[in-house]
Regions:
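SH3/SH3-like beta-barrel superfamily modules
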Residues: 73-111, 156-192
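Boundary regions of SH3-family modules and the immediately adjacent low-complexity/disordered segments
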Residues: 36-43, 99-132, 180-211
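Solvent-exposed, polar/charged alpha-helical surfaces in well-ordered, non-transmembrane soluble domains
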Residues: 71, 98, 223, 320-327
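N-terminal export leaders
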Residues: 11-25
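N-terminal secretory signal peptides
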Residues: 1-13, 35
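SH3-family beta-barrel domains
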Residues: 24, 34-63, 72-75, 114-148, ...
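Cell wall/extracellular polymer interaction/catalysis modules
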Residues: 167-254
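Exported/periplasmic cell-wall-interacting domains
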Residues: 209-211, 235, 247-254, 261, ...
Length: 351
């Protein structure tokens, strides 16, 4: 059984690429030589904003918890970013820190890189629904569109949701009518905070490669996945697999599997194999299931703790990586399909 994800990367370079991947970058071996990948690593930068995950999150004078504490930040604070700093250490902690605009540093574990992109609302929405993503750090999901409306939920950057209509409130603000996919509850969301995902963004990748020409290998020890075409690595990403929490074993199962079921958006609850305890997660993006018990690849907006076990069994990925896996693997999902089931999917090896 292989113990290395790729045959060409040294341990030192693997650590470098792992750190870059944990910052949300995808390592595409097809378009980059090793030298170019190293250059990409050294020049890597983050988005311009970041969202804080929890109250009391500290920033420091240097990229280390041993530095002077500069400030404490609260849940959903949105902070300006300058760049990412990759620590060249070999101990099992997150190696990525973000430098803030005030020149202090915050650990990437506590912080989601986000954007603040406003969008022109799309007036024509097909009756079967259209997939959309949140493009601002977070936005309210209202239970009604009238005066005295109450915010029931918050939707977060990168989450995906099904839109079924465009409306207007008393103040002439445009909103999308969103129906979540588990209980069919209806929410009203500022239409400028969502971007309708175009059909071409859902088309399959490398579709000429036959089913037996693709596979994904997951290393639980290295907390990395590599996708292969005809046994050549084509893409690498950091991940967060299932964890052992006290006497409860939520670790990701080892073995050989196949992707058999996909959803581009899923409302996950405590009965699912999700990432946080006692939490409901709305609009989990790009879900590709590969076991009968519901273990899946999916995008992650509620933590940024890649390269360490963190989930209830699923393979948590940076959102761009989960989107890539969703498109690259079989079965291919037609645009505007809310779910798709097939027993003939891409092979997944977990070691």
């Amino acid at each position: 059984m292989a113990t290395r994800l790729t045959k060409d990367l040294s341990r030192r370079d693997f650590l470098k690429f792992s750190a870059l991947a944990s910052a949300g970058a995808l390592i595409d071996f097809r378009s980059s030589s090793e030298a170019n990948l190293l250059k990409l690593f050294e020049q890597s930068k983050t988005d311009l904003l970041g969202r804080v995950f929890k109250d009391g999150t500290p920033s420091y004078s240097e990229p280390s918890a041993k530095g002077q504490q500069i400030a404490l930040h609260n849940y959903n604070d949105v902070l300006g970013l300058k760049d990412a700093v990759i620590l060249k250490t070999d101990h099992p902690v997150n190696e990525v820190w973000y430098r803030l605009e005030d020149k202090s540093f915050i650990n990437s574990y506590d912080f989601q890189p986000v954007e603040n992109q406003l969008n022109a609302p799309q007036s024509e929405i097909v009756s079967s629904g259209m997939l959309a993503e949140i493009t601002v750090p977070f936005t309210d999901a209202w239970s009604s569109s009238t005066n005295g409306k109450k915010s029931n939920q918050i939707f977060y950057f990168g989450s995906t949701h099904w839109v079924f209509g465009l409306g207007e409130d008393e103040a002439k603000n445009l909103y999308y009518l969103v129906k979540e996919d588990r209980f069919n509850n209806t929410y009203y969301v500022n239409a400028t905070h969502m971007r309708i995902i175009q059909d071409e963004e859902l088309l399959p990748l490398s579709e000429l490669i036959p089913l037996d020409g693709k596979h994904i290998r997951i290393s639980l020890r290295q907390q990395m996945m590599v996708a292969y075409e005809k046994n050549e690595p084509v893409l690498m990403s950091a991940l967060a697999s299932g964890q052992l929490t006290g006497s409860t074993d939520l670790t990701t199962p080892v073995g050989n599997f196949a992707i058999n079921y996909k959803r581009p958006s899923r409302h996950m609850v405590h009965s699912d194999r999700m990432g946080d305890n006692g939490t409901e997660l709305y609009g989990v993006p790009w879900v590709s299931y590969f076991t009968e018990t519901g273990i899946a690849f999916h995008g992650t907006y509620w933590h940024n703790n890649f390269t360490r076990p963190h989930s209830h069994g699923c393979i948590n990925l940076p959102i761009p990586a989960a989107h890539w896996v969703f498109r690259w693997t079989q079965p291919h999902v037609p645009p505007r399909e809310q779910k798709f089931v097939s027993q003939f999917g891409t092979q997944v090896e977990v070691i």
